């Protein structure tokens, strides 16, 4: 699905469920990582996360579009468009839109660790960030620290 198809789908959903036209842009933003979509208050555009379409399918994307259209239409009408507002929650129920989207599967990231050892007492230090061992001393005996592996 490309941005043109997404625009058409968003316009159709707006007419079908809200009985109001969608006059702005709906597009995919591949920089979104943890959110399904967002409604931009200044431009009134809707940005959606393509990963939800790939991972969860068209139905999940339609739910996200309905959720963002709730923000869109309420904001343009001057009503409460935030998640905590009663108007927003009522409109979500009317159009059967999800309040939250299904979380994406997390990638198994191989976190790099750095191991340091004290040359005097043998105390080991495992760190997530690299450090310059010349600038630090052992907290146990004040001996010098040496990097073992990264």
Swiss-Prot record:
Q: Which cofactor does it need?
A: Zn(2+)
Q: Entry's InterPro entries?
A: SprT-like_domain, SprT_Zn_ribbon, Uncharacterised_SprT-like
Question: Does the record carry Transmembrane as a key word?
Answer: no
Residue positions of the active site: 68
Q: Which part of the chain is the SprT-like domain?
A: 6-147
* A biological-process GO annotation: response to stress
Protein family membership: Belongs to the SprT family.
Q: Which NCBIfam families match?
A: PRK04351.1 (NF003339)
Q: What is this protein called?
A: Protein SprT-like
